[in-house]
Structure formats: structure tokens, C-alpha cells
Amino acid sequence: MQPDLHCRTLAAHTLKHFRALSPLTHCMTNDVVQTFTANTLLALGASPAMVIDPVEARPFAAIANALLINVGTLTASRADAMRAAVESAYDAKTPWTLDPVAVGALEFRRRFCLDLLSLRPAAIRGNASEILALSGMALGGRGVDTTEAALAALPAAQALARQIDCIVVVTGEIDYVTNGQRTLSIPGGDPLMTRIVGTGCALSAVVAASCALPGAALDNVASACCWMKLAGQAAAERSEGPGSFIPAFLDALYHLDVEAANATN
């Protein structure tokens, strides 16, 4: 099964719908990236909400358009809140996305993530090591860094997508997005995206928000990856290093015009 290059024309069309809907995205993410994640969603036109208390998380997940679960700074109490939110989302048919940060390196989060899979995420986004570990094909990985190339994890991603009946995203120099039957590849971005904390976590939030859109989930999620790659490339051209990259990236998302990018690439 060979990946297909994702069509930027479709990404442009999807972005218009995304901005019109402005999906309310319930982000239960890690402490390190909350502000950057919220700003990324806002810059693209979504509406982020960081509701983390278990008493509030359960009812809020039912009224949100989408839910993100990111286990980067998982604790026992936070796990309880996340589980409550996912159960509520599942009952309300709210699409939820799992970001299994460092799932191959730490047992508590691995067991937690595996337990959540029975509640049917709409999407899973991780690097190669994380997807390999979640699929049961390999354990390891250096936290949020990856020791595997994204393409090497594609068979695991495809198998996981078929098993859970969801979209799986393996990110790297080229992102691969699969539903187990069809796979899309999204090149682009810039190495500077790996030199700041939070671009992967922010992508997971955008993926989660895109799952709230009508239409084919595979195309919507691939479009989300395309937006982030294009903004990263544009920001790198305007910045001198990691410090200036972050504001340039947010500006690039805010002004993103996929159709114009098509004309210049």
C-alpha cells in the first residue's frame, strides 16, 4: 500500500470549513504546551478550552465539538479526569483524539492509553516510536523524541487504524495519515519545528479539532497536517531561530492561505 500525496486543494477547502465552524476543542493536554496549543488553535480559527478538573471535564466533553487527550504530564488524578472526559465524549459521540506521548517509555501511561482505546478515539497522533509502542510492535523511544523514521511505523499505524477503526497519524519529516485502507503523505515543514517544545502536541489539538468537521475524516485530518507543515515552512523563512520562530509560526497560521501556497510551490 503506497501513500498518496495529499491534495492541497482539498486542504484549502477544508480550512474554509474549519474557520467557519470554529470548533470548540476541549484540550486536556500537558502542562508544558497549554499556552502554545491554545494559541495555535486560535490562530487557525478554532475555539480552545482547557478544562481539566474531573467534575467539570465530564460534562464539558459532552458539549464540546472535539476532545484532545495528551498524556505528556500524566498523573493519577489527571488520568481520572481524562477518563471521565473520554467516557462522556464516547457517550455523546464527541470525536476525541489521543496523543500517546512517550507511551513506549513509561508503563503507567502505556497501560492508561491502551485502556482508553476501547472507547474508540476518532484519531491517534504520535511519532513513530509512540505508534509502534501503542500497536504493540515495539517498546522504547526517548520520550517525545523518536528513534524511528515515520515510514518504518506505517505498517503499525495501518494495523492500529484497522483495529480501532480510526485515523492514525505518524509524524516526522513526512507525515503519514491512514485509516488502515488508504494512506496519505504530507511533506513539508522545517527542522526548526523540532527545536521548540509543542509543535507535535499542537498538531494533535488541530487534528482533534479537524475531527469535528463533516466529511471524510481521513481527508480532514490530513488537511490539518498540511496546514501545520505549510505554516512551519513559512515561519522558518521569516525567522532566525527558535525564539523568533514561535511568533512567526502563529502569524503564519493566522494568515494561512493554502491556495496561495499552491501557486508558489
Swiss-Prot record:
UniProt pathway: Cofactor biosynthesis; thiamine diphosphate biosynthesis; 4-methyl-5-(2-phosphoethyl)-thiazole from 5-(2-hydroxyethyl)-4-methylthiazole: step 1/1
Any one GO MF annotation of this record: ATP binding
InterPro entries for this protein: Hyethyz_kinase, Ribokinase-like
Protein keywords: ATP-binding, Kinase, Magnesium, Metal-binding, Nucleotide-binding, Thiamine biosynthesis, Transferase
CDD domains tied to this protein: THZ_kinase (cd01170)
Pfam families hit by this protein: HK
Catalytic activity: 5-(2-hydroxyethyl)-4-methylthiazole + ATP = 4-methyl-5-(2-phosphooxyethyl)-thiazole + ADP + H(+)
Cofactor: Mg(2+)
EC numbers: 2.7.1.50
Binding residues for ATP: 125, 171
GO BP annotation list: thiamine biosynthetic process; thiamine diphosphate biosynthetic process
Task performed by this protein: Catalyzes the phosphorylation of the hydroxyl group of 4-methyl-5-beta-hydroxyethylthiazole (THZ).
Stated family: Belongs to the Thz kinase family.
Name the record gives this protein: Hydroxyethylthiazole kinase
